């Protein structure tokens, strides 16, 4: 199996390095990742400057672009041979609910799906037990490849930040959602000018049983199938009826 591995935390992030090590025990892995942290880059592509892949001594590549750039360029540019699967992660921090809209981790997987390949995104609810998340992924891939992963979807996997032995199991979940993130951090630069930082994500507002929030909070791996089609199908008919009533 040939796997393209990327992330949004950057090529030197602990999560992607641990996952690459474990995946290489059973697969041919090509790692192409941003040269720095590109968290929350979503599916943005770099269109106003050239992309420069740098091949490192160990054969991995870093790129001066976004996670989506990495997957797009690797699959359309410099990689030779057939890729069987795109994997993105391990992200430092969960991508639950509305997070998937902003997530570069999820976007890298979606870019693989756009280009016709099965793909998964994996995130850890913290920064400690990356080995747990890597083990989960390595156990799931042989079971999923050639079956679920052939659909026009990606799988968004979130793992609790606990030792592997304490994980209670795996649950298939739908996305929850967060409250609005209204906090902005205002500071001053050395010249006294105002500068701003985007604050933390909103708290979980829907973490009922069946959501990804609930699963991870209670010690389960959450797997959510995600599709790029964001059409609100349940509203199509009511919208059509409204237009025709005018």
UniProtKB/Swiss-Prot annotation:
InterPro entries reported for this sequence: SurE, SurE-like_Pase/nucleotidase, SurE-like_sf
A cellular component annotation (GO) from this entry: cytoplasm
Protein family (similarity comment): Belongs to the SurE nucleotidase family.
Alphabetical list of Pfam families matching this protein: SurE (PF01975)
EC number: 3.1.3.5
Role noted for this protein: Nucleotidase that shows phosphatase activity on nucleoside 5'-monophosphates.
EC class of the enzyme, as a word: hydrolase
Binding site for a divalent metal cation: 8-9, 39, 91
Catalytic reaction list: a ribonucleoside 5'-phosphate + H2O = a ribonucleoside + phosphate
Cofactor(s) this protein cannot do without: a divalent metal cation
Protein's UniProt name: 5'-nucleotidase SurE
HAMAP family noted in UniProt: SurE (MF_00060)
Manner of cofactor binding, per the entry note: Binds 1 divalent metal cation per subunit.
Keyword annotations: Cytoplasm, Hydrolase, Metal-binding, Nucleotide-binding
Compartments (UniProt record): Cytoplasm
Molecular functions per Gene Ontology: 3'-nucleotidase activity; 5'-nucleotidase activity; exopolyphosphatase activity; metal ion binding; nucleotide binding
Annotated PANTHER family: 5'-NUCLEOTIDASE SURE (PTHR30457), 5'_3'-NUCLEOTIDASE SURE (PTHR30457:SF12)
Transmembrane segments: none
């Amino acid at each position: 199996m040939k796997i393209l591995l990327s992330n949004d935390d950057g090529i030197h992030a602990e999560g992607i390095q641990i996952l690459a090590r474990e995946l290489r025990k059973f697969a041919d892995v090509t790692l192409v990742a941003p040269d720095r942290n590109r968290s929350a880059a979503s599916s943005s592509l770099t269109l106003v400057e050239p992309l420069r892949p740098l091949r490192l001594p160990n054969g991995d590549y870093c790129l001066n672009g976004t996670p989506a750039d990495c997957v797009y360029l690797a699959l359309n540019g410099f990689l030779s041979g057939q890729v069987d699967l795109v994997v993105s992660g391990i992200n430092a921090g969960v991508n639950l609910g509305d997070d998937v809209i902003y997530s570069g981790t999820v976007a890298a997987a979606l870019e693989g799906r756009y280009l016709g390949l099965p793909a998964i995104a994996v995130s850890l609810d913290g920064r400690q037990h990356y080995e747990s998340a890597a083990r989960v992924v390595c156990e799931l891939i042989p079971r999923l490849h050639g079956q679920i992963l052939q659909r026009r979807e990606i799988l968004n996997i979130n793992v609790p930040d606990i030792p592997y032995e304490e994980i209670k199991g795996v649950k298939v979940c739908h996305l929850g959602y967060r409250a609005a993130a209204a906090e902005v951090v205002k500071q001053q630069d050395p010249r006294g000018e105002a500068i701003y930082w985007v604050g933390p994500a909103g708290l979980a507002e829907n973490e009922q049983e069946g959501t990804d929030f609930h699963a991870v909070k209670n010690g389960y791996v959450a797997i959510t199938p995600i599709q790029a089609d964001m059409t609100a199908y349940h509203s199509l008919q009511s919208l059509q009826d409204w237009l025709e009533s005018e």
